């Protein structure tokens, strides 16, 4: 039995013969080992642990050695020799030679004293030499010493008028010039509905024709949203209306035939 157990352990898995074979209607069971499994496991681990070789760099003698600081008689009191079994000793360089090597690439006055008072005074920032930059948080409050390089409003190119609508533009300019004295008179009378500067620009087209509308355009801030337009029909649906806003967000200042 003992010989059979050793043979079962040493033979490769492909050449092992089952000690016991059992089968039924569902499966076939092959038994390759029979005995105390703990003894086999202990033998396996004891054999594996006995083959371990300790490396030379991890021997107890090398581990017991510590770091040593030596100060020979030929060296100055400020110089110490560092020796360790884990690192390779570097060639020793005196402190004075190290300072000379570090200052080789620096000019003479700078090597003596790199932090002189004259350099500190030169590096100080004068009040008149403050940097100017624009604050992105807000445009209304400006701190002293800072200025905005750009105006608050965006620079948007004005739409170019079409040559076919020049008569309509001239008509609107004439109405705008006529609305200015009416605006001043309305302010004196206290009528807010006739003030063009505060509420908008009122276009009075010829009332005799039934194909015209009274257009009221409010002056809002230029934005991507549609402008506030109020169309009040007088008699029948008109033939003229305002064109939609262009791609810059500003409404066209002329009429377009429907």
From Swiss-Prot:
Region Disordered: start-end pairs: 55-93
Localisation per UniProt entry: Nucleus
InterPro entries per the UniProt record, alphabetical: TDU_repeat (IPR006627), Vg_fam (IPR011520)
Gene Ontology cellular component terms for the protein in this record: nucleoplasm; nucleus
Keyword Transcription regulation: yes
SMART domains: TDU
Organism domain of life: Eukaryota
PANTHER family: TRANSCRIPTION COFACTOR VESTIGIAL-LIKE PROTEIN, TRANSCRIPTION COFACTOR VESTIGIAL-LIKE PROTEIN 1
Protein's job: May act as a specific coactivator for the mammalian TEFs.
Family to which this protein belongs: Belongs to the vestigial family.
Assembly and interaction partners: Interacts with TEFs.
Name of protein: Transcription cofactor vestigial-like protein 1
Primary gene name: VGLL1
């Amino acid at each position: 039995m003992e010989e059979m157990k050793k043979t079962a352990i040493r033979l490769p898995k492909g050449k092992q013969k089952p000690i016991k074979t059992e089968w039924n209607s569902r499966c076939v069971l092959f038994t390759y080992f029979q005995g105390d499994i703990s003894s086999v496991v202990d033998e396996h681990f004891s054999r594996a642990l006995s083959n371990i070789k300790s490396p030379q760099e991890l021997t107890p003698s090398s581990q017991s050695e510590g770091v040593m600081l030596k100060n020979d008689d030929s060296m100055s009191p400020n110089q110490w020799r560092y020796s360790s079994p884990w690192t390779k000793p570097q060639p020793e360089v005196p402190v004075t030679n190290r300072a000379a090597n570090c200052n080789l690439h620096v000019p003479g006055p700078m090597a003596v004293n790199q932090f002189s008072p004259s350099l500190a005074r030169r590096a100080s920032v004068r009040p008149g030499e403050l940097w100017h930059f624009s604050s992105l948080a807000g445009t209304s409050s400006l701190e002293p010493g800072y200025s905005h390089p750009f105006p608050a409003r965006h620079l948007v190119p004005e739409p170019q008028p079409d040559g076919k609508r020049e008569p309509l533009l001239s008509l609107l300019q004439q109405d705008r010039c006529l609305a200015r004295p009416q605006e001043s008179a309305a302010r004196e009378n206290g009528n807010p509905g006739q003030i063009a500067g505060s509420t908008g620009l009122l276009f009075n087209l010829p009332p005799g024709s039934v194909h015209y509308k009274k257009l009221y355009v409010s002056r809002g801030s230029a934005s991507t949203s549609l402008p506030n337009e109020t169309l009040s029909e007088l008699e029948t649906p008109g033939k003229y209306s305002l064109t939609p806003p262009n791609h810059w967000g500003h409404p066209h200042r002329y009429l377009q035939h429907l």
